[in-house]
UniProtKB/Swiss-Prot annotation:
InterPro entries: JAMM/MPN+_dom (IPR000555), JAMM_MPN+_peptidase_M67A (IPR050242), MPN (IPR037518)
Organism: Eremothecium gossypii (strain ATCC 10895 / CBS 109.51 / FGSC 9923 / NRRL Y-1056) (Yeast)
Stretches assigned to the MPN domain: 73-208
Pfam annotation, one family: JAB
Protein family (similarity comment): Belongs to the peptidase M67A family. CSN5 subfamily.
EC annotation from Swiss-Prot or TrEMBL: 3.4.-.-
PANTHER family in the cross-refs: EUKARYOTIC TRANSLATION INITIATION FACTOR 3 -RELATED
Sites where the protein binds Zn(2+): 154, 156, 167
GO biological process, one term: positive regulation of ergosterol biosynthetic process
Protein name from the UniProt record: COP9 signalosome complex subunit 5
Cellular location(s): Cytoplasm; Nucleus
Lineage: Eukaryota, Fungi, Dikarya, Ascomycota, Saccharomycotina
Amino acid sequence: MDTPSAALHRHTVGQLRKLLLHREGSAGCGRLQPALDGSQPLDSPLSTVPSSRSQVRVQQELWKQDPTYFQKAALSALACMKILRHAFDGGDMEVLGMLLGYVQDEMIVVVDSYRLPVEGTETRVNAQMESYEYTVQYLETAVPEGLAIVGWYHSHPGYGCWLSGIDAETQTLNQNFQDPYLAIVVDPKRSKASGVIDIGAFRTMPETADTRSVSSHSNASRYGHHSARYYELEVSYFEVPQERRWCDSRLSVEPPKPADATERAMLAQLLEAAKACKNVKRLQTVDRALVPESIGPYALREQADQDLQFRRPLRSFSSNSIARRSSTEVALGNANEELDPLPTLADANLRNHDSPSADMAMDNTSISSNEEQPHLTFQESSGVQLNAAETEYFDIKNELLTLKLLEYQKARFYRDAFTL
């Protein structure tokens, strides 16, 4: 079974747009349900930078006069998909991140989002000092001019979109410190089960009688025991023209594959070539240990001459004895020749081997064979084998490195082009 993160990665950008739907139901508290399948265009009255009129409204701080001044929250397709992917990556653990955007009239516009390094459990997420340091560094280096932090988001894996007591307290502190501020909650498990994104946007209110009476009409079972402390905003989605053209384009890049049959075959060939090099080097080491390097063709010739001097008296003695035996047995030999005029092949070979000239020929043949096959010939042949094995090894290695480099380039391009 695929994990939620793996299932999300298989979707194209156009298919991910279909996930930007609200959950169905009549008790939507004024939620919008825009169609994102292309038959009905998205609401696109917004841009990625605030207007001058919006900046004037921010300076007036009208939300301080009306606790429920903000009634709408607009999320860009980019921010929404990044939030959803972060929640999917977290799995059963809660995740947390920050929202970037601006204020337009009574609507908080969320243009982008980014993750925070936090400690999360199944029911709680804690931001440590490292998270605040990361937030400051991110604002100084990666946030475009005109955008600011307009809220935070976290996930509720499997138990709906609402604010707990700790969530409401955190939102109240942030609203008092850096208002306008928005809290977004997303449920990745329900989003995957229903096929539409389950998300909610909330703001807290001062604890007054009027707000308590208004919030008492909400469903406490849905929004929790602290539903009187906050209210929900309408959520809509928008796309900037650049995002729409990119989603409608026919750009298609397949994710790079980590390994295939070709790579496995090349790895096997590389191991075989390495073993061949090792075996040739081992044979060279054994041969040098058995035959000293000082033995060469001249040393072999001297050794053969010494053997020849020791063998010659013995060979002459054997020939003289054969001559004496032939003089006493000549009659018997003549009789045998009359019976069998043709000598046998064995007798001819025996006479040839017993002759002194044959002895000299054999000695010369043994000396010449020793001269033609010195120890250096084996070294040269083993050196040729080693060079061939090393050449094959380095060729396969370079081809494999080239293949991995191309795979890295594809992975880098895919990450730069499609990472949200």
